[in-house]
């Protein structure tokens, strides 16, 4: 039997993160851990250890593998053009979210208290934030970041169901960024 390590339970973190954000959107800021830690590990460790060992979302997808059809994922999922294109798309969405946060911070836009799936479909969770709890820009960032995290997790679960477990990992934007960092550190061509 395989020895269990503390990091084998990080899938629970993904569930806790979404549960906390469901009740108070300001907890969405905790998702920055999942955004920054893989980059730091790649920058300072030169490896994809986060993806391979510590990614709670990847572990959750593996746990949900029993719901998978176990079909081979399309080869283009792992192709450079798809991975880099998907990364560019997600970074664009992240940039728009940061810009919206800036507009709210500068007083040029009002707080949009909305969680959106796929950046289009508003989720009717009106109880996630009480106005005045934090600065409007802090809440705006939380709404946007939670939307991105929820959208990417739902995409991952759909892909996981249609194909093999962790098929999402083949084109995950964080995985693509950490792979790029590792290749650059090793002097390899992107």
Q: Model-derived features: where do they sit?
A:
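Non-ligating segments of multi-cofactor redox enzymes
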Residues: 1-190
């Amino acid at each position: 039997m395989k020895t269990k390590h503390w990091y084998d339970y990080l899938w629970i973190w993904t569930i806790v993160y979404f549960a906390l954000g469901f009740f108070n959107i300001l907890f969405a800021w905790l998702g920055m851990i999942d955004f920054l830690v893989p980059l730091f590990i790649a920058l300072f460790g030169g490896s994809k250890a986060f993806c391979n060992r510590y990614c709670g979302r990847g572990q959750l997808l593996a746990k949900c593998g029993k719901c998978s059809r176990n079909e081979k994922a399309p080869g283009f999922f792992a192709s450079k053009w798809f991975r880099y294109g998907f990364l560019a798309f997600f970074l664009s969405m992240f940039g728009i979210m940061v810009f919206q946060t800036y507009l709210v911070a500068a007083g040029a836009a009002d707080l949009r208290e909305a969680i959106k799936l796929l950046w289009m479909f508003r989720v009717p969770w009106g109880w996630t934030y009480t106005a005045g709890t934090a600065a409007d820009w802090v809440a705006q960032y939380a709404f946007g970041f939670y939307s991105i995290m929820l959208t990417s997790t739902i995409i991952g679960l759909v892909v996981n169901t249609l194909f093999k477990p962790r098929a999402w990992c083949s084109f995950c934007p964080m995985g693509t960024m950490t792979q790029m960092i590792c290749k650059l550190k090793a002097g390899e061509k992107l």
